[in-house]
Amino acid sequence: MSNSKDEVERIDWLEAELADTIDEDYELELSEPTLSEKIREIYRKAHPPALPRMDYFRALLALQAELIKLQDWVVYHKQKVVVIFEGRDAAGKGGVIKRITQRLNPRIVRTVALPAPSDREKTQWYFQRYVPHLPAGGEIVLFDRSWYNRCGVERVMGFATEEEVEQFFDDVPEFERMLVRSGVRLVKYWFSITDEEQQLRFLTRIHDPLKQWKLSPMDLQSRVRWEAYTKAKEETFARTNIREAPWHIVEANDKKRARLNCIDHLLKQIPYEDVPHEDITLPERIFNPNYERKVLPPELYVPAKY
């Protein structure tokens, strides 16, 4: 029956997921009933009960407060941190990165999402274009995809030869060991979603004009080559899961839980602690009795439309 308990739970989850789309940016008010109908037609997988919105926000804020402590510790002790986010298209990598960086200093914590290599970069040592983005002391770098493109999208889409992929598998463990020996704290995450969940998220992007930019021709090809990506992922884990930099898999079908679980886990990978801070005193403003404020022409001001 279409009104069975399972069907009701699926519909409830879908409505919560659409509401979460609005929550993500706090700016969007969108009512698109045909969107949920189109997605509901193809969506048949039950989800765990939705995490209550306020519970999610409270947990997220608490974790973000800890991230600020981590940032302060990294700066104080001149630590170097690299976090790699990998996973299938639409797995939620960008979403968790956004929540990590949301309340942090962009001069200290930065995101690297490199485009396809240029013709010049294709002639370089493979890791060369990533090296300039590695952190100095007191910095955290988040890679939204990384050098693992070589054994993922480049391999599956035919942009790298099997010889180049084999060379990568030979080189990457030692490359990462070199980073760790140099003092870099390297953490690697793989965001895992099901075939059906990816389909839902792609369809949401297709029908949401504010998200269509996220959907590339390469994303569409990833649907056709799902099993090839699965094989590539399995070999990647088998050959690059080293003691110095192991992989951590985040179950990401539930975006909110995935964000919280990932941030909580990340905080546990680094032995940060509270660091001393100087007391801040706001100085009094100095008034100059002889200063006469100039009147600026009205055309300099942005119109007060709202």
Curated annotation (Swiss-Prot):
Transferase as a keyword of this entry, yes or no, is yes
* One Pfam entry name: PPK2
Q: In the Enzyme Commission scheme, what number(s) does this protein have? A: 2.7.4.-
Q: Which SUPFAM superfamilies match?
A: P-loop containing nucleoside triphosphate hydrolases
Extract the GO molecular function terms from the UniProt entry.
polyphosphate kinase activity
* Keywords recorded for this protein, A-Z: ATP synthesis, Kinase, Plasmid, Transferase
GO BP terms: ATP biosynthetic process
Keyword field contains Transferase = yes
Enzyme class name: transferase
Q: Which Gene3D superfamilies match?
A: P-loop containing nucleotide triphosphate hydrolases (3.40.50.300)
Chemical reaction(s) catalysed: [phosphate](n) + ATP = [phosphate](n+1) + ADP; [phosphate](n) + GTP = [phosphate](n+1) + GDP
Q: Which NCBIfam families match?
A: PPK2_P_aer
Which family is it part of? Belongs to the polyphosphate kinase 2 (PPK2) family. Class I subfamily.
Record function comment: Uses inorganic polyphosphate (polyP) as a donor to convert ADP to ATP. Can also convert GDP to GTP, with lower efficiency.
> What's this protein's name?
ADP-polyphosphate phosphotransferase 2
